[in-house]
Every structure is written in C-alpha cells, then in structure tokens.
Amino acid sequence: MRQPVEQTSRDAVLVEDAHVRPMMGFEILEPLPARSVPYERVDPFILVHEARFRLSELQDVDTKHPHRGFDNLWYILQGSASTGHSTGPGGTIERARPPEGALLALRTGAGAWHAEAIGAEQREEGLGDTEWRSVLFWVNLARKDKQSEPSAQVLLPERMTVRKEGDATVRVLVGEGSPVELGTPATVLDIGFPDGGEVTTPVPPGYQGFAYVLDGEAVFGANRRPARPPQLVLLGPGEELMVTDAVPGTRFLLMAGRPYGEVPVFNGPYVD
C-alpha cells in the first residue's frame, strides 16, 4: 500500500486581510483574531495588532490597562516611545523607553499593568511629529502557568541575533539566539528583503503559525500565494517556509510555535 508523502515545504493555506479596529481613540490594524482563522489553527498565538501614528496624537490618551494569563510582546518598528509596566505589588509603573528595533516582552502571568506609547517625553523633546509604528502580539500561556510571577525584559536591537538567509536579512526576536523565552517553544522572526529576492527558512515541524506582511509584496508557500500589507498568511504543516518574488523593501514577521492544545477563555485583557 502506498504511504502518503509528508510535505516538507509549507503551503500558504489562507491569505487574509487585516481589519481596522478602533482602540484607545485610534484605529489600528488587527490581523488576528480573524473570523476565518480559528484559534486552534494558530495556537499558541492569540492576537496581533499593528499601530501607526504620530506621537503628538497620544497627548490626551491614557493607555494604562491590566493584563493576565499570556505573554505580551511589543516590537518597535519605527520611532521610539516610552512605555510602562508593573510586575510587582502595588501597581507601581516602571518606565522604559525602548528604541527603534527593540522588543519588550512582558509575562503577564497572574496579573500586570501595561501602558503603551506614553509620548510625553518625546513631545517635550520636540519629537511629537515623529511617526511611530509597532506590532503588539499576545502568546498564550499554559493553564498551569497562568498564575506565574509576572516579569518583563527589553531586548535591544544591538543584542538581537541578525543573520543572512538567502536574499533576506533575518532578525531573531524569539527562538534560537534570542534570550526571550515564551511559555512554549516558538520562533518569531523579522524577515526583510532590502534588494528583493527569495528565502527558504526553517520552521520546526509541529509548530503552527503565520506570516504577517508589513511592507512590499512576495509569494508565500510551496503553493505560491501572493501577499501584501496588511495581510496574514496562514501556514500549513511542514518543516520550512519558502518565500519568492519579494520586491525590494519587502518585510514580514514570521510567528510559529508549538500549540498547547488547550482552549483559552478570553475575557477582554485577560486570557484564562
């Protein structure tokens, strides 16, 4: 009897446009969650938001809010903005100012406060008209870890592992070479094509995930599905992702991780 052949190179099984969502007085792009992408297809990833605006627009916005039960990662694509978080008792906000290219990783665990893009310092320095762009994503924690101690760390761009793969420049946010660890084995990569071209990058078998296109356009997967911003490309099973025909300046985030196989309970800023 002929045995089925396992596919090595992953297909792009779905290409989905991000939708616009109002949040804290702004409009942001929300590629995930999406109605056509059930959580069990992207487990352990819960949410992805892309925000883009000028810091002066933050003047009258209070972004302080609580979280619980997941890893909250905030990647600064452009500009620099202050942020705040509280991981200890009393709710005291600790300030940080991650520069462009930095990653803030907040383990919310049993509960933490967070405030994105506090722009007062930048306005005082005359930087209010600076354009700011970031991606925020939530990654679930196992139910056994949801009451863990909250913690935070900033991965600066100069400490980030950067490597060349094919025609692409790959920055490792999470995965081999990064000090940032999630509750489950995962890889989060910023992949860019300064001059266009192609790349085939490993994605461990058993991981579930997707690509989110930030700039440019390219063809994704063994089945060659074109995608452009702001589209999410859901990946099928396999051991690698092939991306071809990238135009110069193309950039996307690759997010993949080992699923928990648990059904989380979503309750606003909490994931139980």
Predicted feature descriptions by range:
Residues 1-272:
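Jelly-roll (double-stranded beta-helix
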